[in-house]
């Protein structure tokens, strides 16, 4: 078990990434708990905690600068109620391959008024009835969900499904649902992120190079998530970003 200590923060790579954001790389350290983040003094736009053993998305100090969190391949099944207060400018939350199980588990994100991009690919929540519709209804500022742009017709359908008296029963049932299973008992599901061939070493190197040359945050997010999933999307990893609506317009204001 590796603790998030002052020494670890100092040792890990810190750099300005391809889209001119200051980033710290905390990947692959077997970190179980988010802690001691205050020592970074809110100096980063991006914190990358991919490939760790984190179970709870909590314990952040107030960070006004941080806007992007990469948490691919962890065991997260809990999002703290105060996340919006602690991270008021959070724009991108990437949670590919975690253990978010119930629609009710995303309730804290509804208070994140600047959240525009989320991915829950590889989480049990994606198999829930009306998953995408509820995400659209509950997170009105989000413009891209799982690399698919939210369309106006979807927003209207989501409102019709969940708004007002007719949607109250469905809302109440969802808001009462929270995940209670101990994530330590859950083994990662190799098929949870969908079909597709496994990435080859050559694919991985090409994707890493593409990340370095990315022109937008949405492109970085898309490529990072493919690396995290370890699989080639059906349309290929190097497809144009606007095919699924994850283009710069969808992400950047």
From Swiss-Prot:
List the cysteine pairs that form cystine.
none
Identify the domain of life: Eukaryota
The entry lists its GO molecular-function terms as: U2 snRNA binding
Q: For this UniProt entry, which segments traverse the membrane?
A: none
Entry keyword Nucleotide-binding: no
For this protein, the record's InterPro entries field holds: Leu-rich_rpt (IPR001611), LRR_dom_sf (IPR032675), RU2A (IPR044640)
> Which SUPFAM superfamilies does the UniProt record give?
L domain-like
LRR repeat ranges per the UniProt record: 20-41, 43-64, 65-86, 89-110
For this record, the Gene Ontology CC terms, alphabetical, are:
nucleoplasm; nucleus; U2 snRNP
User: What segments bear the compositional bias annotation Basic and acidic residues?
Assistant: 169-182
Q: Name one GO biological process term.
A: mRNA 3'-splice site recognition
Q: Name one Pfam family in it.
A: LRR_9
Claim: Protease is one of the keywords in the record: no
Q: What does this protein do?
A: This protein is associated with sn-RNP U2. It helps the A' protein to bind stem loop IV of U2 snRNA. Required maternally for early embryonic development and zygotically for germline and somatic development. Has a role in the switch from mitosis to meiosis. Might function in alternative splicing.
**PANTHER family, alphabetized:** U2 SMALL NUCLEAR RIBONUCLEOPROTEIN A (PTHR10552:SF6)
What does the record note on quaternary structure?
Interacts with rnp-3.
Q: What is this protein called?
A: Probable U2 small nuclear ribonucleoprotein A'
Q: Which organism is it from?
A: Caenorhabditis elegans
Gene from which this protein is expressed: mog-2
């Amino acid at each position: 078990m590796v603790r998030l200590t002052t020494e670890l923060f100092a040792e890990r790579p810190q750099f300005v990434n391809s889209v001119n954001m200051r980033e710290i790389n905390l990947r692959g350290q077997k970190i179980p708990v988010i802690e001691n983040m205050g020592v970074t003094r809110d100096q980063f736009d991006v914190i990358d905690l991919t490939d760790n053993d984190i179970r709870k998305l909590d314990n952040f100090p107030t960070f006004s600068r941080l806007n992007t969190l990469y948490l691919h391949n962890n065991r997260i099944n809990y999002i703290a109620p105060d996340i919006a207060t602690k991270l008021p400018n959070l724009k991108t939350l990437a949670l590919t391959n975690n253990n978010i199980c119930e629609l009710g588990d995303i309730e804290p994100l509804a208070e994140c008024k600047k959240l525009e991009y989320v991915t829950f690919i590889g989480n049990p929540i994606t198999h829930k009835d009306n998953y995408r519709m509820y995400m659209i209804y509950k997170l009105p500022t989000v413009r891209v969900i799982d690399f698919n742009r939210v369309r106006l017709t979807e927003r209207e359908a989501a409102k019709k499904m969940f708004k007002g008296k007719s949607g109250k029963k469905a809302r109440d049932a969802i808001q009462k649902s929270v995940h209670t299973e101990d994530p330590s008992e859950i083994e990662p599901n190799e098929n949870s992120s969908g079909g597709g061939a496994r990435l080859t070493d050559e694919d991985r190197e090409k994707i890493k190079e593409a990340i370095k040359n990315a022109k937008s945050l949405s492109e970085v997010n898309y490529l990072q998530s493919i690396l995290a999933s370890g699989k080639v999307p059906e349309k290929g990893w190097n497809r144009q970003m606007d095919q699924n609506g994850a283009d710069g317009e969808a992400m950047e204001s």
